Amino acid sequence: MLVILSGVAGAGKDTIKKEIIKRMENIKSIPSLTTRPQREGDIPGKTYIFLSKEEFEEKIRNDEIYEYDIHHNHYYGTSKKILNEKSKEYTIIKDIDVNGTEKLKETLKDIKIVTIYLRVPKEELRRRLENRIDKPSEGEIILRLNRFDYEESRIGLYDYVLKNENLEKTVGIIEEIIRQESKN
């Protein structure tokens, strides 16, 4: 099973994903492929697989990627090989944007997909972005806030839409969703 967490940058996807992995057995994350520069705290091969633009584009040409998109001038995508291998052993939890979610729902026929969209009020989103450790510039904050309306307009793609106001509560709800969906 593949559990997709979506929401705009700052919605809490990564924090929730890490907490779910800590609390639940047999659930893992897989790294995304990206061309963005490595940041402090990134673990190559675990959080991301860092590629040059040329390497990423070669993987696209060779049909090695299920979905990809460009955010803030960098490619992000999901490796077919990694997802196929890991999903045989584990439930995979992955944070993916709305475009990637749509593509995976169209493409993956042999893996059960559960999609969860995390909502956060726009004002709260700005506050979270401004308080991040890797605080984005004002220009990046504006770009991410502009993306908010687009992402919110696509919530019909999702099986579940949760308002993420309280981490503990949201994680508990997602744990229950995963348990219930695993039974089906």
Task: List each model region and its residues.
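Post-Walker A helix-loop "phosphate-sensing" segment adjacent to the P-loop in P-loop NTPases
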Residues: K22-I30
